Design a protein with these regions (language model features):
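Structural recognition of the conserved hydrophobic beta-strand(s) that form the central parallel beta-sheet
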Residues: 86-88, 272-275, 322-327
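Short beta-alpha junctions and helix-cap segments that line functional grooves
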Residues: 203, 232, 256-260, 283-286, ...
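Hydrophobic positions in the central parallel beta-sheet of the AAA+
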Residues: 218, 272-274, 297
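Conserved motor-coupling elements within RecA-like helicase/translocase cores
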Residues: 256-272, 288-289
């Protein structure tokens, strides 16, 4: 059963609807019947819920109202498909991921921002930027994270700068000609605590779904970080089974250099997590030959790991590759 076809965003058989004033009977004895302001549907399923307040009211009142609805079990049954909650006044707008009553936290309700990082408070500007098609569809699918971290399971929605960074990289990857050779796509500069892991995972996952990409390799600069990164990525993997994410999902760790070699050659659009050290050891093997595949390399802490002769040798060894760097400490030409 296909509910949302990612190849038909804003096109094909996908149907978008805006429904106002949906009446919902009380789900808990003693509670009131409720009327939802505005609901956005994709193929008949509620995906984005909007609550509106007049300009004399605070936007947090709309958030509080949705918190109350969650506590009253109103976002159950068919409304369990809700992904994003939006609180609107004429002069302020915030959005957040749908959640449970006990995990509802307004600190995770964000303002939208434009590409210059200016906060968007006007409701019409927000609607044009985030609630239009195809953006609303993309936000509710491509830019959501189902975090399966043990004891911290939660649905998360990406912040504007994370969305823009991911969009820019994917857009540039679409232009890559792997037959041309090693392609340096660009760097993403993420400061500490700004959600680099989420952004890099989404970039890796979306890249792995591109028709001209065979493999995605996420490269850490120390062997010790391989396990931590693999666990983070596996927790975000929508194809993973919580009972056995290491085996069921698309994110694959590499235990040895031989394991890395085997996974690079394997079929399937896996996301491989490995280290610079394993790649360096692999290409120095006497009979090493790069697989005949289009490979996207995403390099973590690129300000440290991309310097030196060993990394240049790695780039030279993979002829059909595209390279993306993530860094929290970029080194410009005048950096000492």
């Amino acid at each position: 059963l296909t509910v949302f076809d990612q190849k038909q965003v804003g096109a094909g058989d996908t149907v978008y609807q805006v429904v106002n004033q949906i009446r919902r009977p009380a789900k808990i004895i003693g509670k009131q019947n409720r009327i939802f302001d505005t609901t956005l549907l994709i193929n008949g399923l509620p995906v984005i819920q909007i609550e509106e307040k007049r300009d004399t009211r605070d936007v947090n009142e709309a958030l509080n109202q949705m918190h109350q609805y969650i506590d009253e079990n109103q976002y159950r049954d068919i409304f369990s498909t809700l992904q994003i909650l939006v609180a609107i006044t004429p002069n302020n707008v915030k959005y957040m991921a749908n959640t449970t009553a006990d995990k509802f936290n307004k600190d995770f309700a964000f303002n939208w921002q434009n590409r210059d990082n200016a906060i968007v408070r006007d409701w019409k500007t927000f609607a044009d930027a985030m609630l239009s098609i195809p953006m609303a569809h993309q936000m509710a699918t491509n830019y959501m994270i189902l975090d399966g971290t043990k004891n911290k399971q939660a649905l998360k929605v990406m912040r504007p700068y994370q969305v823009y960074a991911t969009q820019n990289i994917i857009s540039r990857l679409k232009q890559v000609d792997f037959e041309f050779g090693s392609n340096k796509v660009g760097y993403i500069w993420h400061t500490t605590g700004s959600g680099k892991t989420i952004t890099s995972f989404k970039t890796a996952w979306l890249a792995s779904r591109m028709p001209h990409v065979d493999k995605v390799v996420f490269v850490v600069d120390r062997i010790a970080l391989t396990r931590q990164t693999s666990e983070n990525y596996q927790a975000y993997d929508p194809d993973g089974d919580i009972a056995d994410v290491a085996q069921s999902g698309v994110v694959k760790s590499t235990h040895t250099t031989t394991d890395l070699s085997r996974k690079l050659k394997s079929r399937g659009n896996d996301i491989i997590v490995t280290s610079v050290q394993k790649l360096d050891t692999l290409i120095k093997r006497k009979y090493f030959q790069a697989p005949d595949k289009n490979i996207v390399f995403i390099v973590d802490e690129a300000h440290r790991s991309t310097g030196g002769d060993s990394f240049k040798a790695i780039q030279a060894a993979f002829k059909r590759a595209a390279w993306i760097g993530y860094t929290g400490t970029p080194m410009f030409d005048d950096t000492t």
